[in-house]
Swiss-Prot record:
Belongs to the RNase Z family. Zinc phosphodiesterase, which displays some tRNA 3'-processing endonuclease activity. Probably involved in tRNA maturation, by removing a 3'-trailer from precursor tRNA. NCBIfam families: PRK00055.1-3 (NF000801), RNase_Z (TIGR02651). It catalyses: Endonucleolytic cleavage of RNA, removing extra 3' nucleotides from tRNA precursor, generating 3' termini of tRNAs. A 3'-hydroxy group is left at the tRNA terminus and a 5'-phosphoryl group is left at the trailer molecule. CDD domains: RNaseZ_ZiPD-like_MBL-fold (cd07717). Its cofactor is Zn(2+). It comes from Oenococcus oeni (strain ATCC BAA-331 / PSU-1). This is Ribonuclease Z.
Length: 325
């Protein structure tokens, strides 16, 4: 699992930072990539990256401001020309797009006006607060933000992986590998031929706890941020302004780097990555954003375009239960 920052700027592109897009690379977990926002020129950024458009299966849009969506029609079109990952004997993979009201109309209007005919299907899911996607491996929840427009943060929860089957313990009971092992690994209660009844859970190692990623972009302070980021392994948080511009940040519906750190600390997050940086913060000025945050929350980093952060799998069992909602 990796986070690649395709664009880390705020409002408009600069020479140092393109506008917002984040790729959650789940190549080892499910051979997929999920995008969070698709700012203008995201497809150009992908050309500089090892992330392939054909791997993108889900796109999560936080809100309908241009610096977060103007790259979406172009990305969908270039994905069409570059070819999709083929499944089921040649059928291109579909893309599911999650976002606020008006997103589907926007995308289809642009594609229709440009006479684009996609070789794959786009499925639109209008976001509401709560769980918006869930399967046996992951759950994604949306939390309403405070930005003067319909806006969401996203919480990605990887579900715990069942512990490994302790084969040696079973062999000591005289059992041989076969279908019975499958039932035991599923945690079922099994009656053996010798009359002994065993609980499959007693023959499993500890579960491997899943990872939690929180994506909190354009917003000013709201209690929903803490809910979205609760015990996140990585909290990605906008930091458009420094603490010295807190009044301006509030006026424009944004956060400061100091506020991002306060949110990370309150949510008991493990790591904070700052993004959505205003073009006014260059060089040492950008370093000041990190310094302000580190005074409150030490494990803070600032993202740069095309930078990749690895999120390693956990080895120890998490003692507390994490709510995916």
């Amino acid at each position: 699992m990796e986070l690649e920052f395709l664009g880390t700027g705020a409002g408009q592109p600069s020479k140092q930072r393109n506008v917002t897009s984040i790729a959650l690379r789940l190549l080892d977990e499910r051979n997929e990539v999920w995008l969070f926002d698709v700012g203008e020129a995201t497809q150009h950024q992908l050309l500089k990256s090892n992330t392939r458009s054909r791997k993108v299966t889900k796109i999560f849009i936080t809100h309908m401001h241009g610096d977060h969506i103007f790259g979406l029609p172009g990305f969908l079109t270039s994905r069409n020309f570059q070819g999709s990952e083929l499944i089921d004997g040649g059928k291109p993979t579909d893309v599911t797009i999650y976002g606020p009201a008006g997103l589907q109309q926007y995308v289809f209007s642009v594609l229709r006006a440009a006479q684009v005919r996609l070789q794959y299907r786009i499925n639109f899911i209008q976001v509401r607060p709560g769980i918006i996607f869930e399967d046996q491996q992951f759950a994604v929840s949306a939390f309403p933000m405070n930005h003067g427009i319909e806006d969401y943060a996203y919480r990605v929860v990887e579900k715990d992986t069942v512990g490994q089957l302790q084969v040696e313990k079973l062999l000591k009971l005289g059992l041989k590998s076969g279908p019975l092992f499958g039932k035991i690994k599923a945690g079922e209660i099994v009656k053996l031929e010798n009359g002994l009844t065993i609980n499959g859970k007693d023959f499993l190692g500890p579960d491997r706890p899943g990872r939690i990623i929180a994506i909190v972009l354009d917003t000013k302070d709201t209690p929903e941020i803490i809910k979205a980021a609760e015990q996140a392994d990585v909290l990605v948080h906008e930091a458009t302004y420094g603490a010295e511009n807190s009044i301006m940040a509030k006026r424009h519906g944004h956060s400061t780097s100091l506020q991002a750190a306060e949110h990370a600390r309150a949510a008991h997050a493990h790591q904070l990555i700052l993004t959505h940086i205003s073009a006014r913060y260059l060089g040492k000025m950008a370093d000041q954003l990190v310094k302000q945050a580190k005074n409150v929350f030490r494990p803070t980093y600032i993202a740069h375009d095309l930078e990749i952060f690895d999120i390693p799998a956990k080895k120890s069992e998490r003692k507390d239960k994490i709510d995916v909602g």
